[in-house]
């Protein structure tokens, strides 16, 4: 097999997988690598003490996920654990920053459960593209970013920076469904199954 070098790519233009002799290698290992990644993700979650739960059911008249091409959109996830909402109230009042971070971690875990339900295999996640965090908080609260770090750091810890790093937006609101303190929307890039 030829040596791959950045200089050769820059000088010679496009280098195809065939010219590198990688077509057969990549084609034959794609599904096994995906399966390994999926198992690795679920094992990593178990090692963290957060095994992948069953995907929560929507709390309204909507679908939990929608796939379009290579994008997977996950509806707002609430901090459900074993069918129970775990974090109600307002951050800065009944809920501390640390409790809000833990609630966002649970929302992120539930987003992965939704991805597994839709894709059948977490190894198909190419990357988390964007997250949007909604935070029910008291007037004057300014540490929204710190609270959403619970979800951001979780995705990087579970998927690594390349797949787990993402863009994001967080906003404070007066109320959220069912009285929850946080909700998380997730956009993922995925591979075909």
Predicted regions and their residues:
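C-terminal segment of N-terminal export signals and the immediately downstream linker at the start
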Residues: 25-55
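N-terminal secretory signal peptides and thylakoid transit peptides that target proteins
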Residues: 1-17
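RNase H-like nuclease fold core
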Residues: 64-98
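Mid-length scaffold segments of soluble, non-membrane domains
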Residues: 103-108, 112-114
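Beta-strand elements of well-folded, non-transmembrane domains
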Residues: 80, 135-137, 188-192
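Short, conserved loop-to-beta-strand elements that form functional interface hotspots
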Residues: 146-182
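Phosphate/pyrophosphate-binding loops at sites that engage ATP/ADP/AMP, CoA/4′-phosphopantetheine
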Residues: 118-125
């Amino acid at each position: 097999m030829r040596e791959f070098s950045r200089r050769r790519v820059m000088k010679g233009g496009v280098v195809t997988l065939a010219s590198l002799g990688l077509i057969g290698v990549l084609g034959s290992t794609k599904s096994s690598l995906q399966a390994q990644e999926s198992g690795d993700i679920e094992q990593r979650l178990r090692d963290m003490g957060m095994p992948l739960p069953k995907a929560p059911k929507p709390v309204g008249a909507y679908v939990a996920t929608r796939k379009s091409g290579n994008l997977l959109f996950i509806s707002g996830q609430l901090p459900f654990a074993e069918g129970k909402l775990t974090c109600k109230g307002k951050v800065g009042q009944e809920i501390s920053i640390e409790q809000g971070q833990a609630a966002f971690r649970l929302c992120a875990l539930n987003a992965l459960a939704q991805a597994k339900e839709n894709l059948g295999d977490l190894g198909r996640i190419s990357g988390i593209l964007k997250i949007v965090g909604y935070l029910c908080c008291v007037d004057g609260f300014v540490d929204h970013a710190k609270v959403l770090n619970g979800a951001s750091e979780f995705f990087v810890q579970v998927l690594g920076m390349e797949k787990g790093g993402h863009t994001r937006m967080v906003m404070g609101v007066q109320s959220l469904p069912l009285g929850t303190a946080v909700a998380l929307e997730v956009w993922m890039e995925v591979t075909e199954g």
